[in-house]
Amino acid sequence: MPKTSNVPGTDRPADKAAGHWLLAQLGKKVLRPGGRETTNWLLSRALGGQIDVVEFAPGLGITALEIVKRSPKTYTGVDLDPKAAEIVRGRIGNNPNYTVVNAGAQETGLPDSSYDVVVGEAMLTMQTDKHKLEIMREAARILRPGGYYAIHELSLTPDYLRPEVQEEIQKDLARSIRVNARPLTVAEWTRLAEEAGFEVLDVYQTEMALLEPKRMIADEGVGGLAKIMFNLARKPQIRERVLGMRSVFRRHDDHIGAIGLVLRKK
């Protein structure tokens, strides 16, 4: 786990920092909405053999570590945040075939049709629909024909959720996590994927239980949860933010979930 001072967002006050980086400051490693279970589901379906893998916005590098454990031919992380990029470099070791570039997912600078799998978690949700589509099209551009794009994001249910309810959820999320989160329904994620040039192969849905004890034990272990609780007790400003986030997640529990999708480039 990187030192707290090395975690992105530590230069911002607790009331303004993005929620996921506050959780990282507490020692939370898994910051994805569907937890390790969704990440493992994605990787088990998208990875295998001597393949070339790209990961968009690897963050703390937890999934990057899981990817390189599977010994792909190459791994390329793409992260706009230089602190995050440095953390991931520390995770993946000194293999010359495993690298991290400091770039944005909308314009990676990577060559056309050169990779077998792109992985992206908890980053499309934070974009407008226009920017979501731009990132998905960038994934399509760098993938070889038939390549896989594995994504793990926030979702809304049901598909016929009223627009005013969807807007209320988006506003509450933005206020609590200080990021302009725009989750989509399964139907909306599917339409966007198809517009970007993909077909949906498989879908996994689970609860958005990021801050619930059962999920935290599954993701962090008992010792990890104890460390997080200890740090929460010592940092009242962060504790207030975290409790606010959990309150929003619980308030909208009937409509917020986590989704994993395995997409294939047409």
Predicted segments, located by residue:
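Conserved alpha-helix/loop element of class I SAM-dependent methyltransferases that forms part
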Residues: 32-50
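Conserved class I S-adenosyl-L-methionine
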Residues: 50-59, 150-172
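Class I SAM-dependent methyltransferase SAM/SAH-binding core
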Residues: 60-107
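A short acidic, Gly/Pro-enriched loop at the edge of an enzyme's catalytic core
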Residues: 106-118
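A short glycine-rich, Lys/Arg-flanked "PGG" loop and its adjoining helix->strand segment in the class I
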Residues: 133-148
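Short alpha-helix
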Residues: 181-196
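Conserved Class I S-adenosyl-L-methionine
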Residues: 202-266
